[in-house]
Amino acid sequence: MKGTYDVVVVGGGHAGCEAAAASARLGARTALVTQAFATIGSMSCNPAIGGLGKGHLVREIDALDGLMGRVADAAGIQFRVLNRAKGPAVRGPRAQADRKLYRAAMQAEIQAVNGLDVIEGEAEGLCFDGEKIAGVLVGVETLACAAVVLTTGTFLRGLIHIGEKQVRAGRIGEAPAEAMGLALEALGLSMGRLKTGTPARLDGRSIDWSRLERQSGDVEPEPFSFLTEAITRPQVDCFITTTTPETHAVIRENLHYSPVYSGAINGRGPRYCPSIEDKVVRFADREAHQIFLEPEGLDVPTIYPNGISTALPESVQERFLRTIPGLEHVAILQHGYAIEYDYVDPRELTAGLEVKRVPGLFLAGQINGTTGYEEAGAQGLIAGLNAAARAGGLAPITFDRSEAYLGVMIDDLINRGVSEPYRMFTSRAEYRLTLRADNADQRLTGKGMILGCIGQQRAEIFKAKSEALNSARDLLAGLSLSPTEATRHGLKVNRDGVRRTAFDLLALPDVTLETLRSIWPELKTIPETIAAQIEIDAHYAVYLDRQEADIAAFRRDEGLALPTDLDYASMQGLSNEIRGRLAAIRPATLGQAGRIEGMTPTALTLLAARVRRAGAHA
């Protein structure tokens, strides 16, 4: 026997690292099996972490003492909060990362985890004791264990496409996981093929930057991790350019070489991250598509052109790239490609990401039909915790839709399945006013402490912050003004005779804690970090009761019958994607509509309201 562990994690990507670290934090003796230690923490596609919906997941991973947030802070070279002009519930923290720094930081984190061994080799099969998992085959030897987490990414029988050329690989230059794909197939699991793509990597020294629009980060970078005090890396700019009609002409002329349009690829790609070929075909009337030129590091010339992933032949890639402003003389360091890979229907899984028919086998990341580092990391954390719980004879660890975005994601996956790579959006969450990025620690760290997956440093910081928040809330609750007093201080309130606490007043438009400090100087004792949280809590307090009432009404309507002749095309507020699916499937009830892939809680609420109005006027 090569070794005996409680948990063996297969794969050293974003899901695997979180799974291995989470398992070990819960006290399980854990092994991480990867083809090469040097590839742990690699960013296979874009050099960025976070974004809309995704940034929420990173904060939740961090709140449960995961790695991604801290590593992104250590490697971040441009930080921006997306949707800053909108409400706090839909703001998304995002960071460009230096690939080398990210990989190095993740490897350092993995090496520092107590109870975690890294084993280089290829996992080729699974061992069983009856129907239960008993180990993993690594080469000709066995790692005995009580639970296994598979985080195979795009390696599961991966096939790279560049034009008409095909190469069996899990990532460019790395071997695929052929044997494990066959092993899963032998279990009789429902499986399919998906695909994703990546653009060419460009030499920044050959780009005419003077012609491009500059995109800077936030003046004051906002970290992902609740443990990070400040961002210390030098910050860089990104740049924006666009495709041109000439670009589109070159692509159209060569579509027959694209593996998607030639029929060489059968797997579905991510709807919200289409290739440039798909964009040109699907949006034929568009004369330009935006491209973000993102530096891949502080000391390398490599540029990632976000927005033009492609699998066209190398010569065609060179032609269309040089029709783009600023890229007329661009040199290509690595050509773009598409990759097709196996996935397991996530409806095979429990809420703890355990395969229902194979006790002790857990899956996380792209093997479950998702796309994105953040989605993978969040699943890895949950799978790792549950694998450790399984090995220790503990109850499953789950999070529901009202607790976390990671709960929303897993619930979507295991109940709806996927037909295309799943990506997290804020619109998928019914409770997004509660599930904000800013309060992830307040929602999850306490539960993590009870579970035993939170380290001492985070526990102490969380306790101190919670005490400060409670103290600030108590202080605000103890101060109040009558309408007359409020008016005297320049605050606009209803003349209803009701006294309002300082917390109530914070919910008023244009009222901040700084405004109230001019009335009550004692509020100056509230630290700025706590003040920001309190202001957001106060802003949303009045809406949360309304949201809870809306959700209760929505649940009552789940059994509502939908007319067979309902005109979805004329319904305002629905995306074209949802209109198309409703029209094609024609669900009989609101409940059935809710199970359609891609359906959102907001769309269901609109649908229910439309049917109720129609019934009222019948």
Swiss-Prot record:
One of its GO terms (biological process) is tRNA methylation. Pfam families: GIDA, GIDA_C_1st, SAM_GIDA_C. Keywords: Cytoplasm, FAD, Flavoprotein, NAD, tRNA processing. The keyword NAD applies. The keyword Membrane does not apply. Gene3D superfamilies: FAD/NAD(P)-binding domain, GidA associated domain, C-terminal subdomain, tRNA uridine 5-carboxymethylaminomethyl modification enzyme MnmG/GidA. This is tRNA uridine 5-carboxymethylaminomethyl modification enzyme MnmG. The lineage of its organism: Bacteria, Pseudomonadati, Pseudomonadota, Alphaproteobacteria, Hyphomicrobiales.
